[in-house]
């Protein structure tokens, strides 16, 4: 049994397929390109090392990311990524996600932000049919979810579900990449699986013990509906107790109870019920402001020759596709005008620059002509 399940991870076929999944967006790196160009040979070599116990991961590289917020990120060697991807995709992910409730929406096949937004709309419409605009929402956010995640809690989450031989491989990777007793980097696929798994027991508690129908979680952001403030306060107390036992805490400013009719901010949109039961989505104004600043900066880079117009167009198109998920027709029209005006400003600047240069040349020409005429008169 152990050998069969290990073969699903470290067999040549598994590693070779994993290599093809890992190549996306990284073949510009010399190390990744070299591994991929000699894929069969490298996969066989990696298989041999893993089966003989001579495999040793290379030290991860740490770097800083500044957007959307400043944090430390970790990059691992391509060969190590191939092995870990095989382990995650072939065994860890399918086992860990088996017990998930449907409303656990992050980092899973067939789910994601779009599905999460749609589920919230369904909950709101269902609530309106039963209660109209009356009722409240408890919205929760865990303070520093990944930076404060206990290594003991994460490892225990994996240990409870994974076969011993797979858990041993998982534990070794976690301990080699992350020092100390607390804190993970969310860039790793294994850590993302930990992120959606650690709170799985809480999801079941909320649904089955607290009898909450309208409950949804996207990683460490979650919300639920209730008829009264008191009802939701009781649920909040139970959730806080559960989280504190696992060394987490709710963010005091981002966790609150408020009327449903105020609208629910979730994943970059505000979902608001109208008096007729229709749900409208309004994109976060901060997102619009950031996009305008980003576009202006990128147009400036095009002007300096550091970026292509095509790249800027693609970025703006992607943002419009995101905005279109809400009720944003008028906003998109305004942004189209703003974007067009940015290029007009650039063209006007170039025109003014050319006009100024031309005027200077004319002035210099007149000066030279007057000087020549004066010299001729003097000669006479």
What does each model-identified segment do?
Residues 2-5, 88-147:
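Active-site-proximal segment of RNA-dependent polymerases
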Residues 76-77, 85, 176-180, 185, ...:
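Right-hand nucleic-acid polymerase module
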Residues 1-44, 346-380:
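Non-catalytic, polymerase-adjacent accessory regions of viral genome-replication enzymes
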Residues 49, 118-219, 223-242, 258, ...:
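Conserved polymerase palm-domain catalytic core
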Residues 60, 216-220, 252-253:
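Short Gly/Ser/Thr- and Asp/Glu-enriched loop/turn motifs at secondary-structure junctions
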Residues 25-33, 58-85, 99-111, 173-196:
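Short, conserved non-catalytic motifs in the polymerase core
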Residues 36-54, 59-62:
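N-terminal juxtadomain amphipathic helix
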């Amino acid at each position: 049994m152990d050998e069969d399940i290990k073969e699903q991870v470290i067999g040549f076929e598994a590693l070779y397929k994993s290599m093809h999944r890992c190549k996306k967006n990284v073949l510009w790196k010399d190390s990744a390109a070299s591994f991929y160009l000699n894929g069969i040979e490298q996969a066989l070599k990696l298989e041999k090392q893993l089966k003989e116990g001579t495999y040793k991961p290379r030290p991860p590289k740490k770097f800083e990311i500044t957007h959307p917020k400043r944090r430390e990120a970790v990059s691992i060697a391509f060969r190590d990524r191939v092995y870990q991807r095989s382990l995650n995709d072939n065994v860890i992910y399918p086992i860990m996600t088996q017990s998930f409730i449907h409303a656990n929406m992050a980092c899973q096949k067939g789910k994601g932000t779009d599905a999460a937004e749609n589920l919230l709309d369904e909950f709101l419409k269902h609530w309106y049919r039963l209660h109209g605009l009356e009722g409240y929402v408890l919205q929760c956010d865990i303070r520093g979810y990944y930076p404060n995640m206990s290594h003991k809690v994460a490892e225990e989450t994996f240990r409870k579900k994974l076969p011993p031989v797979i858990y041993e491989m998982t534990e070794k990777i976690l301990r080699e990449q992350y020092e100390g007793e607390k804190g993970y980097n969310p860039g790793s696929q294994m850590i993302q699986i930990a992120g959606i798994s650690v709170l799985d027991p809480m999801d079941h508690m909320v649904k089955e013990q607290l009898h909450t129908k309208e409950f949804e979680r996207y990683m460490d952001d979650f919300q639920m509906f209730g008829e009264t403030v008191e009802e939701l306060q009781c649920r909040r107390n139970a959730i806080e107790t559960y989280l504190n036992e696992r060394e987490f805490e709710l963010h005091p400013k981002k966790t609150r109870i408020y009327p449903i009719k105020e609208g629910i901010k979730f994943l970059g949109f505000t979902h608001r019920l109208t008096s007729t039961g229709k749900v409208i989505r309004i994109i976060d104004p901060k997102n619009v402001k950031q996009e305008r600043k980003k576009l202006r900066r990128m147009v400036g880079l095009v002007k300096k020759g550091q970026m292509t117009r095509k790249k800027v167009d693609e970025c703006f198109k992607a943002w419009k596709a995101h905005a279109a998920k809400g009720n944003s027709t008028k906003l998109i029209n305004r942004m189209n005008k703003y974007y067009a005006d940015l290029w007009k400003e650039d063209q006007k600047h170039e025109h003014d620059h050319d006009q100024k240069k031309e005027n200077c040349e004319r002035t210099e020409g007149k000066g030279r002509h007057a000087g020549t005429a004066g010299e001729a008169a003097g000669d006479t």
